Amino acid sequence: PDRYGHLIDPFGGVQDLGEGILRTPLDAVQTFDDDPLRIVRAARFACQLGFQIDKPTLRGMRERSSRMNILSMERIADEMQKIMSADKPSIGFRILYECGALQQFFPELVALQGVETVEGVRHKDNFFHTLKVVDNLVESVSERSASETLWLRWAALMHDIGKPRSKRFTEGIGWSFHGHEDKGARMIPKMFRRLKLPTDSRMDYVQKLVSLHHRPVSLVDETVSDSAVRRLLFDAGEEIEDLML
């Protein structure tokens, strides 16, 4: 009775909470071996709480990331949606990439990573550029709820997904990614089906924004015609405001 309300904390959880540290109470490798979804969950907690994952836990995540293939995609998708709803989704995706889990279920996104140099000319790393775009978008729509902007966030994450398939180097000109928005838009249905995301109007919305995302850039050109502006307004329809973010 004299110990009623006394917290029993054999693993030092209170201290970890105070210090903003995530760790597994038992052996990390065994923990993630028992249920590999905990790898994605750890990235999600780090993303939502702004906590750091301790090194032994990260090592366990790396060692067992290959076991992601035993999971149903529905379970992974549920965690992905929570990462996408966070204030800084890039944290979760960086962790999943660094531990090798992202490669297991989202290879199209990982394909954006890397910098190639030809004749001294290099292109930017489109993976980390994409994560920055997502974070910037989330910040710019902070007055709107995460549920309201969820599919806009997915569109930002997938906006350059077609670049690896359209990358070209032209001597004397440099790197180009012509048509990457169309290639990316065509990839959306297959990715949504595999990732167990809804293949309804929400997918159509993402596909539309990916397809049109490069068009507003052309409007910066002083020579752009009024008809080009009208075409964009017509093609974008109700999504014009989201497209311009």
Question: What is each residue range found by the language model?
Answer:
Residues 1-157, 161-203, 207, 211, ...:
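Glycine- and charge-enriched loop/helix tracts that form the active or gating conduit
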Residues 154-165, 224-245:
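Alpha-helical scaffolding flanking metal-ion-dependent phosphate/phosphodiester catalytic sites
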Residues 220-222:
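Active-site-proximal binding-pocket segments
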